[in-house]
Regions:
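Lipid interaction determinants
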Residues: 5-7, 19-145
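N-terminal secretory signal peptides that target proteins for export/translocation
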Residues: 1-3
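Sec-dependent N-terminal signal peptides
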Residues: 6-14
Length: 145
């Protein structure tokens, strides 16, 4: 009985060892969708969060292909389509509140989202660039639960 168990034990050990050797990705590429992306840089300049205003951010909701967020003063919303490396925001709209500060940055941010963008995530950063590869926005992630 012991001799018959030895091959089974060796086979089990071998299979467990091989399974442990399979490569696992060290860090998966962060998903564009279903994450809170805080705008931290716009056209090479850091983006400040104004006191008593919402930080500029985007959330791309995968289930309905809707985008929501803030330009810093106004809420923004619309739809989008995305693939492995491009995203296009569509039918973008915003509330129309006036704020004492940050309106220029908000308008630049909203205009920058027009057209097709190239996107890439590295570590906890989302980078958007135009068709020529010029980076215009960087975001940091805050994971949604």
């Amino acid at each position: 009985m012991r001799i018959a168990s030895l091959p089974l034990l060796l086979l089990t050990t071998l299979l467990v060892g091989v399974a442990g050797c399979q490569s696992q990705p060290a860090h998966d590429k962060l998903a564009l969708e279903n994450n809170y992306w805080k705008l931290v840089e716009l056209h090479g300049k850091p983006v400040a969060v104004i006191d008593n205003q919402t930080e500029p951010h985007l959330i791309l909701h995968a289930d309905k292909k809707r985008v929501a967020g803030s330009g810093g003063c106004n809420r923004i919303m619309g739809s989008y389509s995305a693939n492995a490396d491009t995203v296009q925001f569509k039918q973008m709209a915003s509330t129309m509140m006036a704020c004492a500060q940050g309106m220029d940055t908000e308008q630049i941010f909203l205009r920058s989202l027009e057209g097709e963008q190239h996107w890439v995530t590295t570590h906890d950063t989302l980078t958007l660039s135009d068709k020529q590869g010029k980076v215009f926005a960087r975001f940091s992630v805050a994971y949604l639960r």
